[in-house]
UniProtKB/Swiss-Prot annotation:
<dbReference type="Pfam" id="PF03462">
    <property type="entry name" value="PCRF"/>
</dbReference>
<dbReference type="InterPro" id="IPR004373">
    <property type="entry name" value="RF-1"/>
</dbReference>
<dbReference type="InterPro" id="IPR050057">
    <property type="entry name" value="Prokaryotic/Mito_RF"/>
</dbReference>
<keyword id="KW-0963">Cytoplasm</keyword>
<dbReference type="GO" id="GO:0016149">
    <property type="term" value="F:translation release factor activity, codon specific"/>
</dbReference>
<keyword id="KW-0488">Methylation</keyword>
<dbReference type="Pfam" id="PF00472">
    <property type="entry name" value="RF-1"/>
</dbReference>
<dbReference type="GO" id="GO:0005737">
    <property type="term" value="C:cytoplasm"/>
</dbReference>
<dbReference type="InterPro" id="IPR000352">
    <property type="entry name" value="Pep_chain_release_fac_I"/>
</dbReference>
<feature type="region of interest" description="Disordered">
    <location>
        <begin position="285"/>
        <end position="309"/>
    </location>
</feature>
<feature type="compositionally biased region" description="Basic and acidic residues">
    <location>
        <begin position="285"/>
        <end position="295"/>
    </location>
</feature>
<feature type="modified residue" description="N5-methylglutamine">
    <location>
        <position position="235"/>
    </location>
</feature>
<comment type="function">
    <text>Peptide chain release factor 1 directs the termination of translation in response to the peptide chain termination codons UAG and UAA.</text>
</comment>
<comment type="similarity">
    <text>Belongs to the prokaryotic/mitochondrial release factor family.</text>
</comment>
<protein>
    <recommendedName>
        <fullName>Peptide chain release factor 1</fullName>
    </recommendedName>
</protein>
<dbReference type="InterPro" id="IPR005139">
    <property type="entry name" value="PCRF"/>
</dbReference>
<dbReference type="InterPro" id="IPR045853">
    <property type="entry name" value="Pep_chain_release_fac_I_sf"/>
</dbReference>
Length: 360
């Protein structure tokens, strides 16, 4: 492992010890804000420091075992121990490099998930409903909370568009690679000839930004319309104009929210989604301007950015970004999508490591 990496790990270990002492200080304990901040920093360093300590211990064990190589009775055991420790050290060094990668500060935030039906008419709307169910089941398995903000249901079931907020630990970091075009190939229930149709939906995942990070939005740039919201089949029809539609005139971004019975609450939620969308648009613009030659595994949420195909006749799901195919479509549609999400995260980390080594 490079000396620069070891120096970095040494400084993190020192900081970890310093934080441990601070968290036992009565003055810090009585200051709730500082105590919470230090506790968070301490827990963030825990994994990298414990991994580094294990790495150092194995090196120490190898040095001790090398002394025993001169002992005829212990030589064989010592050689086996050295070989095993070297293999573990190699794995730990890979883990440490990943742990040292720059963290996306947004990864710990809640997120807004938008699903829109694309090409394919009614079948695309039904598929949007299937995707929403898939993400809902996944969120339930993670003990995350889903809050529906806006839903435009399609006539044959499913949604023309649905926007939800998902809250929980590390939500955005887990779901951010879901942005992009999702394509389904199957025989629709309304198809009498048994022909396979291809339909598509777009998914966009954006972090819910804290107020301190929200962009300043000029009220003069907004057009705010109110209307009466209604649930499925006209249920829960409000007698007041509580639903809110906000148009950001400079970008043309439109956000609707009809979740709450209070117009004020709907407006606040719509503004939060709008702020996240504005930031996302700016990020995508910067990424295009940089014209990065590396693969951008982080989808844009653009319809043309096809990331995944769900093929029902073959029971397979293919992620086109990393050429990954799994033949467990039923499980995937029931929310078991970790086997699709984790390989993308791993590949993204590998790309980051490659970029860092190029810089060095």
């Amino acid at each position: 492992m490079k000396a620069s990496i070891i120096n970095k790990l040494d400084s993190l270990s020192e900081r970890h010890e310093e934080l441990q002492a601070l968290l036992g200080d009565a003055t810090i304990i009585s200051d709730q804000e500082k105590f919470c901040a230090y506790s968070k920093e301490y827990s963030q360093l825990e994994e990298v420091v414990s991994t580094f300590n294990r790495w150092k211990k194995l090196h120490s064990d190898i040095e001790e075992a090398q002394i025993l190589l001169d002992d005829p009775d212990m030589k064989e055991i010592a050689a086996e121990e050295i070989e095993a420790n070297k293999a573990e050290i190699e794995q730990l060094e890979q883990n440490l490099q990943i742990l040292l990668l720059p963290k996306d500060p947004n990864d710990e935030y809640n997120c807004f998930l938008e699903i829109r039906a694309g090409t394919g008419g009614d079948e695309a709307g039904i598929f949007a409903g299937d995707l929403y169910r898939m993400y809902s089941r996944y969120a339930e398995s993670k003990r995350w909370r889903i809050e529906e903000l806006s839903a435009n249901e399609s006539e044959q079931g499913g949604y023309k568009e649905i926007i939800v907020k998902i809250s929980g630990e590390g939500v955005y970091g887990q779901l951010k690679f879901e942005s992009g075009g999702h394509r389904v190939q199957r025989v629709p229930k309304t198809e009498s000839q048994g022909r396979i149709h291809t339909s598509a939906c777009t998914v966009a995942v954006m972090p819910e930004l804290p107020e301190s990070e929200m962009p300043e939005i000029n009220p003069a740039d907004l057009r705010i319309d109110t209307y009466r919201s209604s649930g499925a089949g006209g249920q829960h029809v409000n007698t007041t104009d509580s639903a809110v539609r906000i148009t950001h005139i400079p970008t043309g971004i439109v956000v609707e929210c009809q979740d709450e019975r209070s117009q004020h609450k709907n407006k606040a939620k719509a503004l939060a989604v709008l702020a996240s969308r504005i930031v996302q648009v700016e990020k995508e613009k910067q990424a295009q301007e940089q014209a990065d030659t590396r693969r951008n595994l982080l989808g844009s949420g653009d319809r043309s950015d096809k990331i995944r195909t769900y093929n029902y006749p073959q029971g397979r799901v293919t992620d086109h970004r990393i050429n990954l195919t799994v033949y467990r479509l039923d499980e995937v549609m029931n929310g078991k999508i970790d086997e699709l999400i984790q390989p993308i995260i791993t590949e993204y980390q590998a790309d980051q490591l490659a970029a860092l080594s190029d810089q060095n």
